Amino acid sequence: MQAATVVINRRALRHNLQRLRELAPASKMVAVVKANAYGHGLLETARTLPDADAFGVARLEEALRLRAGGITKPVLLLEGFFDARDLPTISAQHFHTAVHNEEQLAALEEASLDEPVTVWMKLDTGMHRLGVRPEQAEAFYHRLTQCKNVRQPVNIVSHFARADEPKCGATEKQLAIFNTFCEGKPGQRSIAASGGILLWPQSHFDWVRPGIILYGVSPLEDRSTGADFGCQPVMSLTSSLIAVREHKVGEPVGYGGTWISERDTRLGVVAMGYGDGYPRAAPSGTPVLVNGREVPIVGRVAMDMICVDLGPQAQDKAGDPVILWGEGLPVERIAEMTKVSAYELIARLTSRVAMKYVD
């Protein structure tokens, strides 16, 4: 009998990279594998994508794991370095790094390195999180061009705040700021992540940085799924029934008795709960697949179990397979039901969930 298991489909992952190349044919791909590749496994994901042009991570530790695992492609530190003492390692490992503040720039100017570092100057075009403000950007850029520890030319990167809202006007403003600053500068350019790739072809430039869409999940909050853009779900969260019980009309289920059956039915108990990372907020009616058939969760999600209404005539039995999201049940639907973003759902599964990779 199978307990909570994440099944990662390598074929779907490779398909998605190819599909994104079709959407941005003139751009190189930074496959973003931060946060354990959005819950898909850092090394296994990188090894599945030998055709990616580079990999993007959030922490130096993630980059070092890639190198230790045999990944030789360029690795971009999307948030830059947090400590000047890391610069010799970044140089020796040929990592690319974002540079987004005065402290990082000063550290580069003062460092003693054997080789210069490939730098992506981060321009704050409107996210207002990391990056150099436009009014300070020319002076900052000039210092980078004069720094002996920076490999020339300097590349330029930014990030959209509302790429998933095509009618709000914010992305056009960010693009205008980015284009104005980049004009006449020789370095590579990148501003498009998943939403930019899908909705803003004018933003693709030299490099794009697919994150969640690489894993077959839509970044948009418009009820779309990855399949609407030709991508396939890479992750399936699976488990099995551990019990099937007769349940009488009028009987409650689970903590607090929040769901009461309106008919005689058969109740399935699934080995899955918030201890595995499944959202405790999932309301009654949230769908799961049992033997490929959609049935609703009933009652509260517990730490280790959820209950589902199999129906009065159900023939399901203990040990039968359950899919919580993935193939046949997009995680975007679960996100909509639970009000928990798909990003969080796929990235927050706990260590007791087994990982299985298939082709």
Curated annotation (Swiss-Prot):
It comes from the Bacteria. GO terms for cellular component: cytosol. The keyword DNA-binding does not apply. Substrate binds at R129, M303. Disulfide bonds: none annotated. Its cofactor is pyridoxal 5'-phosphate. Its EC number is 5.1.1.1. Belongs to the alanine racemase family. This is Alanine racemase. It comes from Shigella dysenteriae serotype 1 (strain Sd197). The gene is alr.
